[in-house]
Amino acid sequence: LVALVIYSVVMAFLLPRVLAGTTAIIPLGVTEFGEVTGPVPLVPGSSNITQSIYMIGNLLCFLLVAAAAMQPDGFRAVVVGMLAYATFSIVFALVDLATYATGTADLLGFMRNAKYTLHNDTEVSGLKRIVGSFTETSVFARSTLGVLGFTATLWLCGWRGRWSGLLALASIVLLVLSTSSTAIVGLPVMAVVLYVSSLQIAFQKVSSTAWLFGVIAPVFVLVLALGILLDPQVSGVVRSYLDTTVFNKLDTDSGVERSSWNTLALQNFIQSWGLGVGVGTTRASSFLMALLSSVGVIGLVLYGLFLYSVYLRPRGVARSFESDVRMAARNAAAGLLVGDLLLAPSIDQGLFFYALAGLAAAVPVRHAFGTPHSAGPGRAA
């Protein structure tokens, strides 16, 4: 991660100047052409600075969380903090729905102060587009996919079962009702991730929750699918909802615009000979396109090594509280990454993602006379 951040910051200042005018970009920030939404020649912009600062901030977040989690008490505190974040995220979503239904949405105006137009009072198929504490429905959905990955995995492992299970269930309901294409596409992906994790948990440790989920989940999905298919009215509603939120999305003005961003981002990658045009220079609508267009092949390799070293490389004691939390952090990061691949305009993945990475990377130091396994924050009865 350190190498990725250093490379990103250096290239953010170097590449837009060295490659100036060699390709057309959709500026992420303000350039010498002002605030524009269409293609302009490659030039440095304000977001080269702001995105570099965000990258440095993400690195500091990762290091601070990893350092705090190196102690058993700190590790447990970070886990509780993650659950608190999940709780507040869901509470804000419920408040968003409640204030909209009662005509008191202005009460949330103190945190909806962005300069651009916010679509936080629109409906799709009769459902309010949920934004919670975020600026857009898609951003809310992306964060909630991460919350689902973390809380559902802890529930499968039996840690804080009532709290984590309730949060996971609430996340699923809110994602379905959010009307976000990110949520509708991301939910099946997370279902597969969580099902594979349940099988892994069931074979590694004694967990009745994981065993029951592994047996019941496929049956539930089959019964639900048959119920929808056999009821013409219900299947019509579901089909209409999917058409509106997913299948017809690319034909909307927003879908066409976002597709053009990705097309131009890929062109930036090719015309820069695989180097990219610098972090914060151009706008995309997919994390992969943003990564390629910003930091090129070298950045892609560094990011892949970061993911492997943090989320995939074995560390610590197997079948322990820490290993369960690492799996939860990995699944949460998978949820966030799914959302990023569908909508991210830049390579900044935010503090939530890098806090999860810090938690996954930490191996708490055992005291000389301590027990070999952490007791964790408590199992559900």
Regions found by a protein language model. Name each.
Residues 1, 154-166, 311-330:
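Membrane-interface helix-loop-helix junctions at transmembrane boundaries of multi-pass membrane enzymes
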Residues 1-3, 11, 27-93:
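Transmembrane alpha-helical segments and their membrane-water interfaces
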Residues 1-32, 308, 319-324, 362-381:
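Transmembrane signal-anchor hairpin modules in multi-pass inner-membrane enzymes, especially those
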Residues 6, 13, 91, 96-104, ...:
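A membrane-periplasm/extracellular boundary helix in multi-pass inner-membrane enzymes
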Residues 11, 240-291, 295-302:
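TM-adjacent membrane-interface loops and short helices in multi-pass inner/ER membrane proteins
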Residues 52-64, 77-110, 117-197, 313:
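Alpha-helical transmembrane segments of multi-pass inner-membrane proteins
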Residues 73-82, 159-165, 203-219:
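Membrane-interfacial entry segments at the cytosolic side of transmembrane helices
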Residues 315-343, 349, 353, 357-358:
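Loop-to-helix entry and N-terminal half of a specific, functionally important transmembrane alpha helix
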